[in-house]
A protein has these predicted regions:
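Basic, amphipathic alpha-helical hairpins
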Residues: 1-12, 24-36, 56-60, 77-86, ...
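Short, Lys/Arg-enriched anionic-surface-contact patches
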Residues: 10-21, 54, 62-71
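Basic/polar phosphate-binding segments, predominantly the helix-turn-helix DNA-binding elements
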Residues: 39-68, 91-113
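Amphipathic alpha-helical surface "interface" segments used
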Residues: 20, 24, 43-46
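Terminal helix-turn-helix DNA-binding modules in bacterial transcription factors
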Residues: 25, 58-97, 119-126
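C-terminal interaction modules of eukaryotic adaptor/scaffold proteins
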Residues: 116
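The cytosolic transmitter module of two-component sensor histidine kinases
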Residues: 16-20, 38, 87
Length: 126
């Protein structure tokens, strides 16, 4: 019985981690969708938003919205470095319907505006 109990605990621990990895992969592959948010992901994976929020926060030490924003801003940085698109277009490419909100999130995560980030990149500071 002790062995069975231990195995069940291992399964319980492993399964949430697998779910979280699938959710993270889904976000990383679909961050461009402007509607990407907790409710959409919860529906996709058949969880209540409250349960998914708690599971993600417990496993990743950050909420889903923060994770989505981090993925989007990292993608925006890659687009900025390519120097092929205007910043307003980059905000759309990475899933932000509102360019002002994109600037706010970018500055919050990177400590500077997208334009300043690009300048720092070319100066070798990032």
């Amino acid at each position: 019985l002790h062995t069975i109990g231990r195995k069940l605990n291992e399964i319980k621990i492993k399964k949430p981690n697998q779910i979280i990895e699938r959710i993270k992969r889904y976000i990383e592959e679909n961050y461009q969708i402007p509607e990407m948010r907790l409710s959409l992901i919860a529906e996709k994976f058949n969880f209540s938003p409250a349960y998914l929020s708690a599971l993600f926060k417990n496993s990743c030490n950050q909420n889903i919205t923060d994770y989505i924003n981090a993925v989007r801003i990292e993608a925006a940085c890659r687009y900025l470095i390519q120097n092929e698109y205007k910043i307003s277009h980059i905000s759309e490419l990475v899933g932000y319907a509102n360019v002002t909100y994109f600037y706010k999130v970018f500055k919050n995560l990177k400590g500077c505006s997208p334009r300043d980030y690009l300048g720092k990149y070319w100066e070798g500071e990032t």
